[in-house]
Each structure stands twice: as structure tokens, then as C-alpha cells.
Amino acid sequence: MRIGIDLMGSESSPITLFEAVYLAAQKQRNVIFVVLATLPVVAKIRENSVFSSFLSQSPCRIEIHPVSNVIEMDDEPVISVREKKKSSLVTGLRLIRKKRLNGFVSAGNTGALIAGATLLIPMLPGIKRPALLATLPTERGDVVVIDVGGNVSCKARHLVCFAQMGAAYQRCCLGIEKPKVGLLNIGLESKKGTSEIRRAYQLLQDLQLKTKSKMNFIGNVEGRGVFEGCVDVLVTDGFTGNVLLKTSEGVSVFLLKQLKHSLKDISQLQAETILKQLHDEFDYEEYSGAIICGIDSVVVKCHGKSSSQAMLNGINGAIELVQNDFISQLKQELNVETL
């Protein structure tokens, strides 16, 4: 298995991201990691005694693929993909298209990654737009949220495709036979929301009546109900989904800080035990990035401010998707759902 890692274009240091590759390579002995970085970054990696020693001792475990350009966070997505063809991001996607990589992980420009994936990698049958799929913790386990930033605005038919992909993901990866699917809305009633959301509600309800449908559409879900775990798949447009995701990240950080302050009067051991349990469950860095769902390859988008641990989780998530043959399973699930 070959996994590509883009070290460039994020708000994190490339060396921080390479540390994740180094940690992954120590444990994932059946994986070859292809690192994409500019020559100055490659030089810094080789200047690090720990990294340099590992590269010399295990030359086949990490391949360094120098690139000459970088797509920055503030670059216009489509233009940058077309003009910066030798950037780390575009090079990684081209390697995926040529079947020289089994998966690709980047913490770079989200819009450029999605635009590049759409332009360079075939879409799955029946899917018109890719979407970012991420997971959030709830009272009853993780919920899949789709879309969390791929499409600022969506037609009703796109939301239906997102629902199908999210449900297929839950069946493939978590073994939920008939996932509960809900539309994120401002109220529970079917007449609430924008015209596209109302139309999507009707389309999903119609799909529910199909005898072969493998999802359980329960209707609209309000924001406060998301974390109660009332659904397995939460469907929304990318603008709203991204706001939900980043708000939940901020709230979790705030609550952990407040709790840490509140626990100052109990024993250090008790406090550390409680905080570790909550940190493992609610810290967004513990989750394996967002999947670009709808393309015919495994591409994972990590947080733009990823720590080495967050990037490591993204890398491990991509490896797991490839090992589980996620794309083939997703194709099969979507084929059944659209019959």
C-alpha cells in the first residue's frame, strides 16, 4: 500500500506534519509513505537527526517526492489547481489518478483539494458533486455529517446524494444495516427551511418508500438534537455543516478548559483521569479528518491547523479506508441504493 502525504500549504509547520509520517511509518510496516514537499522543507527534514537516521535506516519506508510549488490557503481553488500543476497538492492527486498511490492525505487548501479531486479523479457512478464527510461524537456514538465544507450551496438532489453516501459509509465502516438519516434544519416540521431543503425532504421521503432503500429517513433534525445521537447520518450543505463542525470544535475546547478549572479542587489523579476520558472523546484532533466522498479514490482532508497527532489520525484513517476496500464497498452500496 502506498499513501501520499502533502506537507505543504497548511497553517501547520511541514516538520510537524512530517513527524506524523515518521510516527506512522514506525508502526505501519506494510505501508510506503510518499511525502510531497518543496526542496527547502526536504532539506530541513534531513537536517533533523532523528528523521535523517530513520530515512537512512529504512529507505524503502518513506519516499520523498520533491515539488516546486505550493497552493496556499488563500489561493483561489480552481485557478490554483490549473496554474500550480507542480504543487504538492496537485501532484498528489495526479499520482492517485495514475494509480501510483492508494490514498492521499492533505491539510492544505480545502477548496483546492476538492476542486482538484473533482477535476483529476473520476466521480463514482450517479454522483454529481463530491462532499466532505466527517464524524462528530454524540451521546449514542459518532454521527456522520455530510457535507462539512465541500459545497457552500446545494440543490435538493445533491442533498439526496449526500444522504446516500453517508448511509453507505455507516453501513460499510460501522456495520449499521439501516442507518437513520436526518436533514439539519431550523425546525422538525416538513415545511421548515429553504425551498431546496423542503424539496430534499420530499425526495428522501419518496426514496424511503422504495422497497430496496437501505436508509431510514427520520425527517428534520434541529441543531440541539445533533449531539443527542438521534441520527447516524446528518445531511446538510457545506456552509452550514462547516459552521456546525467548527462551532462544535470551539465549544469542546472551551468546555474542556472550563472543566479543567473546575476540577482543581479534587486530586490530581482523579482530575487527570476524568480529563483524559473527555479529551479522548471530544477533542477534534482525535478524529481522522474528513473524507472527500463521491470520488473514485481515498482522499482525506485534515484540519488546516493539524498537530502531528491530528495528522497521524488522518493518515491512519486513510490506511484503514484502503485496507477495508472502502471505495469498492461504497460503489456497491450506491449501486443497490439507486436501483
UniProtKB/Swiss-Prot annotation:
Enzyme kind, highest EC tier = transferase
Where in the cell does this protein reside?
A: Cytoplasm
A Pfam family matched in the record: FA_synthesis
SUPFAM superfamilies the UniProt entry points to: Isocitrate/Isopropylmalate dehydrogenase-like
Q: Which domain of life is it from?
A: Bacteria
Q: Does Lipid metabolism appear among the keywords?
A: yes
Q: Which InterPro entries match?
A: FA_synthesis, Phospholipid_synth_PlsX-like
Keyword list (alphabetical) reads: Cytoplasm, Lipid biosynthesis, Lipid metabolism, Phospholipid biosynthesis, Phospholipid metabolism, Transferase
The UniProt function text for this chain reads: Catalyzes the reversible formation of acyl-phosphate (acyl-PO(4)) from acyl-[acyl-carrier-protein] (acyl-ACP). This enzyme utilizes acyl-ACP as fatty acyl donor, but not acyl-CoA.
What does the sequence similarity comment in the record state about its family? Belongs to the PlsX family.
**What assembly does the database describe for this protein?**
Homodimer. Probably interacts with PlsY.
Protein name, UniProt field: Phosphate acyltransferase
- Originating species: Protochlamydia amoebophila (strain UWE25)
Q: Lineage of the native species?
A: Bacteria, Pseudomonadati, Chlamydiota, Chlamydiia, Parachlamydiales
Please state the gene responsible for encoding this protein.
plsX
